[in-house]
């Protein structure tokens, strides 16, 4: 997995381009000077991507390369042993928040299902340990076979519930 990348100048370029900055003479002069010296490379934002390889003897064969739904980069990613599905968890800098807390991709790298934490959590969101940027909700995730993912939810008080997700049905088991 390769995280989202940008040049050092990208966000300042984006800020100046948006005209959300104060319209003072001093700032407008800075903007004009900055914009004269910016290159096309400075304005490119490269999204988070993933590559899946199959190992064959001593060689590796690229199966697919895709852009992931995560804004910056998933915190964790797991792959079924047969490559039939891939799951990503959370977003870097914002664990537990957003629409891509849990994403299931198929064997070709296409997103099949996305979840917010409130859609999958067996606990109220207030039960999880919180920091300024994140909700710390899971203790572990792993494939228990090629079609099932075990996810361990853990609260701030160390209560745990393990849920099994079926990647074929795209649903949690009861």
Language-model segments: residues:
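Secretory-pathway ectodomains
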Residues: 1-174
């Amino acid at each position: 997995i390769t995280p989202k990348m940008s040049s050092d100048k990208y966000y300042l370029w984006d800020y100046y381009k948006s005209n959300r900055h104060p319209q003072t003479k001093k700032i407008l002069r800075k903007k004009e000077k900055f914009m004269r010296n910016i290159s096309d490379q400075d304005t490119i934002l490269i999204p988070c991507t993933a590559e899946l390889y199959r190992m064959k003897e001593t060689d590796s064969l690229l199966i697919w390369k895709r852009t992931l739904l995560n804004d910056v980069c998933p915190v964790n990613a797991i792959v079924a042993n047969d490559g039939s599905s891939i799951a990503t968890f959370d977003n870097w800098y914002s664990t537990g928040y957003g629409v891509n807390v849990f994403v299931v991709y198929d064997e070709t790298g296409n997103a099949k299902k996305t979840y917010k934490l409130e859609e999958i959590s067996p606990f109220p969101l207030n039960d999880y340990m919180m920091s300024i940027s994140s909700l710390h909700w899971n203790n572990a995730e792993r494939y228990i076979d090629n079609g099932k993912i075990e996810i361990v939810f853990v609260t701030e008080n160390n209560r745990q519930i393990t849920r099994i997700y079926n990647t074929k049905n795209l649903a949690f088991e009861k």
